């Protein structure tokens, strides 16, 4: 009998969620029923760095004024490096934005403190718990970084909404 590590379990869960939840989320977030999900989820559309194809994925976010904070895993976020322009379906409206990828541990810790305070589920999904002082657990954060987790700051372009 083989045992499965927590990292493998998390990876398997992530793949399951992508396969089942993502298509359903895309449909709902594009529909008039988006309100049931759009307070915490958005659709982000970007261009693949290798394929050149337009790709769309649902993702959880925390809003800080005109900046959205995304905790991201996997490798798709690498498409967002270098100030990529992205298109969002945010609370039923199309918006354009520019990305800023954060991979530095100290900067990620600051952002995760905000994420954990506003949406603890997002942190748990990435395997990062809050310490008693509200900051992310240092070991959890380091392990997440080793797994390829990053933070993406999505800066909304002022006055640019696409209907």
Language-model region placement:
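Alpha-helical membrane-targeting segments
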Residues: 3-41, 121-134, 142-148
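Short, structured beta-strand-loop surface elements
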Residues: 7-8, 74-162
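Short beta-strand segments
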Residues: 39-73
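Short hydrophobic/aromatic-rich motifs at helix boundaries and adjacent loops
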Residues: 1-2, 14-17, 47-49, 83-84
């Amino acid at each position: 009998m083989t045992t499965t590590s927590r990292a493998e379990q998390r990876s398997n869960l992530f793949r399951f969620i992508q396969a089942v939840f993502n298509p359903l989320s895309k449909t709902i977030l594009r529909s008039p029923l988006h309100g049931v999900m759009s307070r915490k989820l958005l659709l982000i559309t970007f261009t693949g760095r290798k394929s050149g194809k337009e790709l769309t994925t649902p993702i959880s976010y925390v809003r800080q004024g005109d900046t959205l904070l995304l905790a991201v895993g996997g490798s798709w976020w690498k498409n967002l490096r270098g100030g990529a322009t992205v298109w969002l379906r945010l609370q039923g409206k199309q918006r354009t934005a520019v990305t800023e990828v954060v991979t530095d541990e100290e900067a990620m810790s600051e952002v995760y403190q905000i994420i954990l305070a506003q949406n603890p589920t997002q942190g748990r999904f990435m395997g990062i718990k809050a310490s008693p002082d509200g900051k992310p657990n240092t070991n959890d954060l380091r392990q997440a970084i080793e797994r390829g987790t990053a933070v993406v700051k999505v800066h909304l372009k002022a006055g640019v909404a696409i209907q």
